[in-house]
């Protein structure tokens, strides 16, 4: 299995937790391209972009099946940036602008576009989207309404935004504050907005999901649940460590932030499992359909191995 060096995976990485019946070797990879490892079928299990996996639900070219372990979650309010000279004073000003994305299928962009449309009235059809690539799966093609321009990757979205070639960008990079004088957050008060968004929706946006080779779970269906249980146990140990850290952490206000998070999100803020996360998965599937990643709206039950639907 390969995944990033996450605290919630630490007990699996160091072998403290072992999935029942499985001799698991974990290879930690923190490079940005680690998610492409499944394309060569190199690993039996791997974290992968959820948006791309959803786009492949019709084609099934990846050869992997998801379980409801959402390896990475992140709010994306703070990953939407603007050029200060673009005249973008509010999200509504993005209509008709040129907005950069790394790839149309990237889960970060799916959530950010959905957020901007649902909460702030963005019309995606009015925007010219500037992408490094439009890599798809199977015979996937961009929707007919999509106005998209592909720029050479070496031009870099950061430089395009800084130089005013694009007006805004949705990215995974930390480009503000104080990184470049011409770049700023669309939402400078992103922390308060993220708290409000979570309180209203209960969503902590899913980015990466754990996939297992379809050939493995077809031969041994029990593997899906064994891996699910092991990841849950690893997360439990992570929570125990974070609680201990609140009075030992080097960070100045970690205890206050930890206690605030517990008050707002409860004792299990990093939700995994099917039942409790179904509304959020359904919203992501809705966004994927609206944005042309899928030709129909899939149901959450179609996304995961059947043995995990009772979790």
For each feature predicted by the language model, list its residue ranges.
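Short, glycine-/small- and polar/acidic-enriched structural segments
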Residues: 4-122, 129-136
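Short helix-initiation/N-cap motifs at beta->coil->alpha
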Residues: 25-37, 89, 130-162, 258, ...
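Secondary-structure boundary elements
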Residues: 87-89, 118-126, 159-167, 219
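Pocket-lining segment of extracytoplasmic ligand-binding domains
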Residues: 144-242
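Secondary-structure end/capping motifs
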Residues: 211, 217-290
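Short hairpin/turn module used for nucleic-acid contact or packing/dimerization
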Residues: 282-311
